[in-house]
Every structure is written in C-alpha cells, then in structure tokens.
Amino acid sequence: DRPYETAKADGIRCVSTLAALADTKPDVLVLCNPLKAMPQILGALKPLIDTDITTLTDVGSVKAMVREQVKAVGLEHCYVGAHPMAGNELSGWESSDPTLYDGALWAITVDENTEYQRFRAVATMIVDHCSNRLIVLDDATHDRCAALISHMPHVISTAMINELVANPNRNIAAALAAGSWRDMTRVALTD
C-alpha cells in the first residue's frame, strides 16, 4: 500500500485493478511490469481494453519475446514495442528519480503489421510529452543491441560478484575495492 499512498500524495491517479485501469480508456497504456509477468497481464488485459482506442506499449528490455506474447493473446494490432534506454540499479517507488528519463533515448520497435497511428501515439508520448528522443528498430535488431550494451554488462557484473563471494580472500578483496569495482558491479544490485 505504501507506494500507492506515496504516488497519490504526489498527485498520481492510482487504480487498484486492471478493469479500473481499462475503464479510464487510455490513449496509450504503458506496461511497466516484470517481463515474467507479461503473459498473465496481457491475458487479463485482453478482454478489458478497448483496442480501437488504446495503443499498448511496454518498457521491457526484450522486444521479440514480448511481441510474441502480445500476438499469443491477440493484441498485436494495437501494440508498439518501446524500451527507454535509461535506468539504474534501484527499484521500487521510493527509489524513483524524476530526472532518470531526462533526454533519454527510447527504442521503438515495429514490424510490418504496426499501424502508423499506433506508432505515432507512442512516438508523440515519448517526444512531445516526455521530451525524449527515439530510434525506430525491428525487434531482432533491438534485442541484439540491447544484449550487447545492457544485458551482457548485467551478466558480467553478476559473475564478478559471485566470484568475489566464493573467494576465500573475499574480505581482503572487498577492502581493496575502489571505483572500478563499484562501477563494474553496480548493475548486479538490480533485482
């Protein structure tokens, strides 16, 4: 309840169910949930949203998988993939940073079935309403590039932490750690 109370205090309108959200008939609905929850959320949204009105997008870091999940529930005609290239190792409402997306680059992913007005709705949200920048890609190109510059650093960072924890001299190594260690392992703190 605390994140909702804080959000409400900050002037953000909160709803407690997907049905209540769908009742607001948003122009653009941005899914900001963990990727593993996507199939369940998409399945629950399908009978609730008016796809003639609402364009569906998400901020997931993997686009091809999400598009397949969107297709599996029959929402592909109203979907445009999006991935803001901004973030940090923190999570939760209390960790939010109002400047995190300032000037951020968003990858918008489309395919041959993406409707132009859907693309335009998401692009307008990103550029006009959020003052951000965008690049348009196909899902596969996005996923390969995101793996290289975002996912691989997470894997390497986690491997470094695991190596330290398993090392019998971990306390000495931790005492010697400085800026390079901090910078290389920061993203391992994500959940």
Annotate each PLM feature.
Residues 32-34, 60, 110:
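Glycine-rich, N-terminal phosphate-binding loop of Rossmann-like dinucleotide-binding domains
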Residues 13-19, 135-137:
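Short acidic-hydrophobic, aromatic-tinged amphipathic segments that line or gate anion-handling sites
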Residues 10-11, 75, 129-130:
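Short, structured coil segments at secondary-structure junctions
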Residues 100-190:
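Internal alpha-helical scaffold of NAD(P)-dependent oxidoreductase catalytic cores
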